[in-house]
Amino acid sequence: MNRNVVQSENTFNEYNLNQDDNYDWYTSLGVIRARTCDEPPLIIKIDIALGYEKGDEQTKTEIDLRSIEIKDFLRKYFSKKSKSEITDKNEDFFMLEIKNFINDNILSNSKITEVKFLQKDIEN
């Protein structure tokens, strides 16, 4: 099967994450694959970093413990989006929605403060 990359957005890289002294970054979720709601569906691959207060080991531990729930949420979240929605202009909105959902519905003893995209690819 021929897979063509339709869109590739590397909107935030490891170098930039390391430059922000206010946060530690959880980058171990890995690449999450989902199918868009387009007909026919496209494949989206995303990798995100979750920022939390520097030195907050409780948040890091809780993210580790809840990583399966976070990945499942992200897969479902992007499965409800179309290619036309997954654009740079909507990225700030996505990051805010993702942060709020994780804080309100997945994490119970801690909070993340930032969400950044490390990778966002859409394929045929």
Predicted segments, located by residue:
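Flexible, low-complexity charged segments
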Residues: 1-124
